[in-house]
């Protein structure tokens, strides 16, 4: 099985979906990532970025909750922990499971068991890897 599980809660920049079907996605080329009015899916429906905009529902929240409830280590990268429902995922981490938050800015958290790595994503993930290799 997949040891490393992740959930793209707010979508993916290199995917598109139709404005009528957010569940069927299409890969976007990294060399030509722009979407334009008139770009359509195979059914002739306008494509949009596969991204959750502010005010839209977060369709992947239920699968994310299931992953969090079952995780051994919970890692959050780049967040203020102020935007819900995503910020509420911390409520589903089992007691005693390690929580790491990688963000260069100071983040006010309502839990005292979060281990902060105050770096950008690339450097923070490298540091997390070293910490995990030392402790596990």
What does each model-found stretch correspond to?
Residues 6-8, 51-53, 99-101, 116-117:
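Conserved beta-strand scaffold positions in the cores of enzyme catalytic domains, especially
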Residues 10-12:
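Catalytic cores of enzyme domains
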Residues 17-21, 40-41:
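Short cysteine-rich clusters marking metal-coordination/redox-active sites
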Residues 20-27, 130-135:
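Short, surface-exposed amphipathic charged segments that create phosphate/polyanion-binding patches used
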Residues 22-24, 43-46, 79:
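Short Cys/His-rich local motifs and their 1-3 flanking residues in nucleic-acid-associated proteins
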Residues 30-36, 52-63, 81:
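A general structural motif
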Residues 62-136:
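SIR2/sirtuin-family catalytic core signature
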């Amino acid at each position: 099985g997949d040891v490393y599980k992740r959930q793209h809660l707010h979508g993916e920049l290199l995917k598109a979906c139709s404005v009528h079907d957010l569940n069927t996605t299409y890969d976007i080329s990294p060399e030509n990532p722009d979407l334009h009015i008139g770009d359509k899916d195979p059914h002739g429906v306008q494509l949009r970025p596969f991204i959750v905009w502010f005010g839209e529902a977060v369709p992947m929240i239920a699968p994310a909750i299931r992953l969090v409830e079952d995780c051994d280590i919970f890692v959050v990268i780049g967040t203020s922990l102020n935007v819900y429902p995503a910020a509420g995922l911390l409520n589903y981490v089992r007691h005693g499971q390690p929580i790491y938050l990688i963000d260069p800015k100071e983040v006010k958290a309502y839990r005292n068991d979060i281990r902060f790595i105050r770096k950008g994503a690339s450097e923070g993930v490298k540091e997390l890897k070293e910490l995990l290799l030392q402790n596990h």
